[in-house]
Every structure is written in structure tokens, then in C-alpha cells.
Amino acid sequence: MKRVINKVIVRVLLTALVTAVPVMLVCQTTSDGSMPQYYFQNFTPGQVKLKGGQVQTPLLNYNTVTEKMVFARDAKYYDISNPEMIDTVLVMGTRFVPVGRIFYEVLLTGPTALFIQHKGELMSAGKQVGYGGTSQLASSVYVTSVELSGGRYNLPLPADFIVKITPVYWIRRNNEMSSFLTEKQFINLYPERAKEIKAFIKGNRIKIENREHLKKLVNFCSSLE
């Protein structure tokens, strides 16, 4: 009897996590059937770990345009609309955590934690401008999401479009979040250690855009504190 009650509770919690209004799959595909707004190529079984300890395994993907976790069921998409109930989401070995109403990818945990915010912009694929070239500037039509009641999003995408993704890096130190995009911005987060960090970057040929390099750099900075 207890097991049946637990299953009912988990089912109710999962229902609360998804929006009531679905987004049809066909509305978010391009002419070739691809969905470039999504971080992963396909929806795959993932894990949604709730703060209460329950775990669900729906088909998941991450929408880089809305920065929301998306749940697929019966050929429809649902935004996970109550991220405050979630502890962690795992998709294909990648860990995400809620930050406000959106999700960040986790690269490092510990006293200094490292995250990536995947920010996607939808824009038209561009017009032909001669010699077989394509100009995005000639037809840059950005598509914005439309917020509906309850924080739900529906993206009316054009037939052909591209997604420009800009990674924003975040570190959490002393319970404070700080963002950076470049090496210089990262060094500015540690003004008292700038000389040592510059030497480490040069000596180890660190490239900020390489996540393994970045993890190594953050671990080094943590060792200085």
C-alpha cells in the first residue's frame, strides 16, 4: 500500500513540473526535421531528481533559446515549469541545475563551482547574395519566444533558421555568482591573484573556451584561496 501511495505522489509531482499547454513537435522542426534550438541531437531518457528525493526518467532535452528543460511525451513538448522543486537534471551524462527559472550546466562543484549558461538566439538562415554566398546580415530576423501564462513558452519558428549559441560562464564563490566570457574578465574576478593566474594560463596554454582547460584553471584558482 505504501509503495502505491509513493507512486501516486511521484506522479503528481511530475505532473506539477510540466506545463499544461503542450508545444507540438512539428512546430519546432526545420524543413529537414532537425531541431537546432536543442542542446542534444535527440530527446533521450534522463533523470529528474526532485528535492524531496524522488527520481523520474522522462525523455529530456535542453532548449538553448528558452534555457529551459523540456520534457517530451506523446509527440508533444512540455517545459518543466517548476524548477524550484528540482535538485538536479541529468541528460546523457550532463548535469544541469536550476538557477531561477532557467537551467545551467554544471562543470565543477565545491567551494568554487563552475557553470555554463547556454544562451541561444534564433535567426533566419540568410538570403543568397551572389556567388553562392549567404548573408545573415541581409535578412537577420531574430525570433523571440512568447511568454504565456504560468511561465510557458511557445516558439513559432520559421521553416528554415539557425541558432547562434553563446556560452556564458559562471563561478560561484562565497555564495556569490559571477559571470565571464573572456580570459580578461575571468582574471578580473581575482584581482589579488592576477599575476599568478596569468602565469598559470601562459604556462599551461589555457584556452577559456576549452571546458577541460577552464576546469583546470578554476581548480588552480581554488587552490590559491
PLM ranges: what are they?
Residues 49-55:
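Short coil-to-beta-strand transition motifs
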Residues 153-216:
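A short, solvent-exposed beta-edge/loop patch
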Residues 1-31, 217:
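Bacterial Sec-dependent N-terminal signal peptides
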Residues 29-45, 49:
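Short N-terminal segments immediately surrounding and downstream of signal-peptide cleavage
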Residues 224-225:
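Short, solvent-exposed mixed-charge patches
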Residues 56-178:
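Aromatic-patch recognition
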